[in-house]
Amino acid sequence: MEIRRRPPNPPIKVDILQYQIKHPEAAPRHILEEIVWHKEKEVAQRRELVPLVKLQSLVKDMTPPLDFVGALRQSPRQPALIAEVKKASPSKGIIRADFDPVAIAKAYEAGGANCLSVLTDEKFFQGSFENLQLVRSAVQLPLLCKEFIIYPYQIYLARSRGADAVLLIAAILSDKDLRYFLKIIEGLGMAALVEVHTLEEMDRVLALDGVQLIGVNNRNLQTFTVDLQTTEDLFAQRREQLTQGDITLVSESGIYELADLQRLQQAGARAVLVGESLVKQPDPQQAIAALYGEV
């Protein structure tokens, strides 16, 4: 899947004037490309407010990140759970109107989640880095920053707000970027959850050094359709490489009930990332127990 990082006809500035040349492919081809194009602008604006060097200085004085990978691998409950703090999505709209990130995070922690994922994209998911910081102050669990990362700046921003791990989406990053970002993440003592959806993306990620977590997104980020068969197929085709590399497979999206957990665990998933089906319930703590068939 090819993702264009920018529109083919970017605005051109001449002194105080700005113009744009018409182009037949000037519109994003799908939602993922639209998100990436917006992220380009968003990161540029953030850099103007807080330079990268400031973020790098901030993270130097922070306590070391929590062990995100270890929390998943040492879980007595299988598959391990990454519970997501999520208000909305492009496909579902508002998932929880009375959204309180701290209350939800505390409920997840009380329910036995191993790690948390916090959405930080503002425009499409109504998340924020402020939410990440609030959650960090409220719970003791390792945190994943769920962001569409396309620049190192976002990695440092995530760490400065308390993230212990970040999401890297193979579909929107080149192999060169993935290698570079993995080195930055390792240098910060963080973990990377590298997300794939196709066999081609899986093979690209398996060829990289230092990958400990691979997330299989059961949701097609172009169409937003969901199929748990995605996890089953990819693990079946690359079981040997994943096992030999001691890589923990995380299944993401489309997980609603115990039967889904059992199906994915049988397929080879050692952890799951669950958001919508938990956050939309009145009591997220109780929702975790129900998901694992404990009530």
From Swiss-Prot:
It catalyses: 1-(2-carboxyphenylamino)-1-deoxy-D-ribulose 5-phosphate + H(+) = (1S,2R)-1-C-(indol-3-yl)glycerol 3-phosphate + CO2 + H2O. Keywords: Amino-acid biosynthesis, Aromatic amino acid biosynthesis, Decarboxylase, Lyase, Tryptophan biosynthesis. It is an enzyme of class 4 (lyase). One of its GO terms (biological process) is L-tryptophan biosynthetic process. It comes from the Bacteria. One of its GO terms (molecular function) is phosphoribosylanthranilate isomerase activity. Gene3D superfamilies: Aldolase class I (3.20.20.70). InterPro entries: Aldolase_TIM, Indole-3-glycerol_P_synth, Indole-3-glycerol_P_synth_dom, Indole-3-GlycerolPSynthase_CS, RibuloseP-bd_barrel. The keyword Amino-acid biosynthesis applies. Pathway: Amino-acid biosynthesis; L-tryptophan biosynthesis; L-tryptophan from chorismate: step 4/5. Its EC number is 4.1.1.48. CDD domains: IGPS. Belongs to the TrpC family. This is Indole-3-glycerol phosphate synthase. The lineage of its organism: Bacteria, Bacillati, Cyanobacteriota, Cyanophyceae, Synechococcales.
